[in-house]
Amino acid sequence: MADENQTNNGEAAGAQAQQGAQFNIQRIYTKDISFESPNAPAIFTKEWKPEIKLDIDTSTNKLEENVFEVVLSVTVTATLGEETAFLCEVQQAGIFAIGEMPDQNKAHTLGSFCPNMLFPYARETISNLVNRGTFPPLNLAPVNFDAIFAAYVQKRAQQAQGEAPKMDA
């Protein structure tokens, strides 16, 4: 009886390990960094009321079976009137192992979940770069990657519907 329980517990542990192994962070790293302050030092004499523009983009590269690199590109541009105070670009990347799952779930994981994990690293890097440029602190607000991904999926679906009649013609 005790041997039977040990066997069942071992099988259950193995099944749980397989289920838990569907997602694994292999590495998070900074792929590229750029900080420019083209109008320094004159920009430091101006009143600091910048317009901040934030651009976010993601890309995914398949490295091998079920292993993907996700790159989150964040660009922050601060302008005072017509002058650029600073331009900060960060590519934060991660290598993720994603086990077997439906394509829709995998797309959501790569397009939303992974960028959401990378964003705090990119935000910290940008904050540090802006600080080293001796500009006032810049604290980027959280980003809703689920909403961004949902908009992307909806746009793709609309494009597919719009292109379908052209293919039939």
From Swiss-Prot:
InterPro entries: SecB (IPR003708), SecB-like_sf (IPR035958)
Pfam family, one: SecB
Keyword annotations: Chaperone, Cytoplasm, Protein transport, Translocation, Transport
HAMAP family noted in UniProt: SecB
UniProt similarity note: Belongs to the SecB family.
Primary role: One of the proteins required for the normal export of preproteins out of the cell cytoplasm. It is a molecular chaperone that binds to a subset of precursor proteins, maintaining them in a translocation-competent state. It also specifically binds to its receptor SecA.
Protein name per Swiss-Prot or TrEMBL: Protein-export protein SecB
Gene: secB
